[in-house]
């Protein structure tokens, strides 16, 4: 079993006729993802990589029965695309787009609260790598060849550090159930806590690797959830131990602005609740191996 995505999940690509959307749609299809169509306003009635293109998400969902979508839409229009997906009945939406204005994401978050919690779309991102369930399906931009199918979940703000963790674990023969990149923006759809809840409920996930970074309260909130609810072992790496306060480091959300937002403070908070800490990026894999052997 995987979380959020399996080989049967019917996927729509929003922005499929653009250069980036078209490229990654093909990559996902080649990996085995069940891409059933795409959406580009004004391009309805055409096709891309053998799947139909629709003008609206509503029409696309009605015609294909899709339950998931991925957004490759320029920043000025991405928020509208996310809200359109929610209104069309999409259950899981991955927003790859980087540079969506914070004000637009506040609008998206407020808009999605109109729906009851049980009917609310799960938004992953924006500015994220997406989701991969190895050997089953890819809903994102990850390099599928570095993932081995297995029983360790990965969740991280940094896509590339998620790749690094997966590659190290593959070399050690440790497989991944699902990997989720939640994105590095200060306002995003799903938090560490949201994804940890899904992994804790998944019988095929035996442990979780969590990759955090400086800035924001997400790691502290995750630590509280781990302390109170998680029975599965958690391994963590927090990027930015040498980052100076007040300077943005890569992601828009990677900036230390308050107590508890530095990497060292986050490491201490996580260690206090029993999380195994990888001291460097190069040691994520061996830390996971050590924890799994002890479990």
What do the PLM-derived regions correspond to, one by one?
Residues 1-295:
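Catalytic-core regions of core metabolic enzymes
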